[in-house]
Regions:
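Phosphate-/nucleic-acid-contacting segments
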Residues: 40-138
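Charged/polar, solvent-exposed surface patches and flexible loops
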Residues: 8, 12, 35, 39, ...
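Short alpha-helical segments that sit at the start of domains
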Residues: 19-46
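Cyclic-nucleotide recognition modules
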Residues: 1-19
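Residues forming well-ordered secondary-structure scaffolds
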Residues: 5, 9, 28-32, 59, ...
Length: 139
């Protein structure tokens, strides 16, 4: 279990500093929010058999605005669009979304990295399938 948490922590570290600065400078609000959802899902998400990711609601409205460096109106509009598209389904304290929904953010984050010998999975779903499973008390 400690090994699984360590792998997930290292995965988040590779997605952090340079990518975070680039996102804040160049990405639209939707992509900034999805990038956060990617890192949140790495730590707290559970991939279901039908390709959906279920995780606890990521943030309060206030914190969502701080993380995305965006106004409440911008973040509210993004979430409203996601819900209308059926991509962001809230169920109590959890949210469910298709793994492919965040692929644009995942791919953008990966393209911003330096090249290396390690080949990352092409899709976010493939990444979650490759990570060691966590036994999470929330589920």
């Amino acid at each position: 279990e400690l090994f699984a948490y360590t792998i997930r922590l290292l995965e988040s570290c590779t997605l952090s500093d340079r990518v975070g600065f680039a996102l804040m400078a160049f990405a639209p609000v939707d992509l900034r929010l999805k990038a956060f959802v990617v890192t949140w899902a790495i730590h707290y998400g559970k991939l279901t058999a039908d390709g959906l990711i279920k995780c606890p609601i990521p943030l309060t409205r206030n914190n969502r605005c701080l993380v995305a460096n965006a106004s409440p109106v911008s973040t509210d509009n993004a979430l409203k669009r996601w819900k209308e598209e059926g991509a962001w389904i809230r169920d109590g304290d959890f949210v469910t979304f298709p793994a492919a929904f965040v692929d644009d953010a995942y791919q953008w984050m990966r393209s911003a990295e330096e090249s290396s010998e390690y080949t990352y999975p092409n899709t976010f779903r493939e990444l979650l399938e490759a990570l060691p499973p966590l036994t999470n008390p929330w589920y």
